[in-house]
Amino acid sequence: MKTIQIAIDGPASSGKSTVAKIIAKDFGFTYLDTGAMYRAATYMALKNQLVVEEVEALLALLDQHPISFGRSETGDQLVFVGDVDITHPIRENEVTNHVSAIAAIPEVREKLVSLQQEIAQQGGIVMDGRDIGTVVLPQAELKIFLVASVDERAERRYKENIAKGIETDLETLKKEIAARDYKDSHRETSPLKQAEDAVYLDTTGLNIQEVVEKIKAEAEKRM
């Protein structure tokens, strides 16, 4: 079985990270959560009270405190800036509401995309984000474009937040997700869009395992 690159793109809370992790584990591939990288950059900007115009200061912070990944004893992904574990802080609502603005900064994307491409050279990889199939891994053997209704995605995020103890209002989440969809698909640099050769998959009404099986079937055709 040959190793391949699998690119999974889609809007916020479409289930990308959840299915990407499972697929990577099942195939023994590396999983790279690109969204966590942009969240880490956003967390650093907020913590240092930087506004989006302060690009040089943010790039300097990213150099001083490199983003890296690790594993907990239970096998869960950990996210670090420098040697500080920021796995949980980057999922807070404040970071979620600002990440689109930071991710739209061309210099930040350029820096992180370069790092993502470097990691992808190491072999079989599953990467999820907004521009993996179009910008980061345009040569990926399998590209998936995952979508789901705003209502369903808000429900998923609501349940995730409640499970993590993050106070959340469902109607507010719906508005935030719709607003983020607009920002992500209308930004000038690497907007969210389906790659021409991507497999379109609407996950509305499907459970995680059903989505995983559909993607794995597509992957196995290419191995």
Swiss-Prot record:
Keyword Nucleotide-binding applies: yes
Any GO MF annotation of the entry: ATP binding
Pfam families: Cytidylate_kin
Entry-linked InterPro entries: Cytidylate_kin, Cytidylate_kinase_dom, P-loop_NTPase
EC number per UniProt: 2.7.4.25
Binding-site list for ATP: 10-18
Gene3D superfamilies referenced in this protein's UniProt entry, alphabetically: P-loop containing nucleotide triphosphate hydrolases
Keywords (A to Z) from UniProt: ATP-binding, Cytoplasm, Kinase, Nucleotide-binding, Transferase
Enzymatic reactions: CMP + ATP = CDP + ADP; dCMP + ATP = dCDP + ADP
GO BP annotations listed: nucleobase-containing small molecule interconversion; pyrimidine nucleotide metabolic process
Compartments it resides in: Cytoplasm
Annotated GO CC locations: cytosol
Major place of residence: cytoplasm
Family the UniProt entry places it in: Belongs to the cytidylate kinase family. Type 1 subfamily.
Protein name from the UniProt record: Cytidylate kinase
Species per Swiss-Prot/TrEMBL record: Streptococcus pneumoniae serotype 19F (strain G54)
Native organism taxonomy: Bacteria, Bacillati, Bacillota, Bacilli, Lactobacillales
Gene designation: cmk
